[in-house]
């Protein structure tokens, strides 16, 4: 897990607003340990640099709450979003705990908003090997349509890189998410350049939290 933590440190030091731990093959104990280490790491970066990167856990509500993570992200294979959100809001998680939901259509996004999600991921916007199971790329025009239809923040995902991040942000998306820009084969400079490109292009005012 040292490589994963190294990527998290790179993202945090570059000023990423958050990192999402998406390790679907890890058992509960190993995932718990990784998340705790990630939380300690970003706390160190916060003390060193003042950057406040949040840690979100993909799919595992139980691990996210037990570790004290900042939130959970729910996908199509997770517990139903409506049930998870209700449980969190009824005292199962701290008040500031964030719940996000992956969506692949306007209908999905509206359902997530109605259920009480704090934000949604929408995509794939562009072609991405990790997102092909969810259909063809939807493009910037569809991203704009969905972003304008929602009252909660929308994060664009799927094939996002430093060259097209600004295009996504210009549609009204609150932010972008990327996997390939932080994989092991990517240099630290490339990861930093990606975060800088996102921050320089983002003029949208959103608060994805209750802090």
Which residues make up each language-model segment?
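Conserved N-terminal beta1-alpha1 strand-loop-helix module at the mouth
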Residues: 1-119, 137-141, 145-152, 161-171, ...
């Amino acid at each position: 897990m040292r490589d994963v933590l190294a990527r998290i440190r790179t993202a945090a030091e570059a000023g990423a607003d958050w990192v999402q731990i998406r390790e679907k093959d890890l058992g509960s104990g190993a995932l718990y340990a990784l998340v705790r280490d990630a939380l300690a790491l970003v706390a160190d970066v916060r003390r060193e640099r003042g950057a406040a990167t949040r840690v979100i856990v993909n799919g595992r509500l139980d691990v996210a709450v037990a570790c004290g993570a900042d939130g959970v992200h729910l996908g199509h294979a997770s517990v139903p979003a409506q049930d998870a959100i209700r449980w969190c809001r009824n005292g199962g998680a701290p008040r500031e705990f964030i719940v996000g939901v992956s969506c692949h259509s306007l209908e999905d996004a509206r359902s997530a908003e109605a259920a009480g999600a704090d934000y949604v991921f929408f995509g794939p916007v562009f072609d991405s090997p990790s997102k092909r199971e969810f259909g063809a790329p939807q493009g910037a025009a569809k991203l704009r349509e969905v972003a304008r239809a929602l009252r909660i923040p929308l994060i664009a995902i799927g094939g996002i890189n430093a060259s097209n991040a600004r295009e996504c942000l210009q549609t009204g998306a609150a932010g972008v998410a990327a996997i390939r820009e932080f994989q092991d084969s990517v240099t630290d400079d490339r990861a930093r350049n990606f975060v800088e490109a996102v921050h320089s292009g983002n003029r949208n005012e959103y608060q994805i939290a209750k802090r």
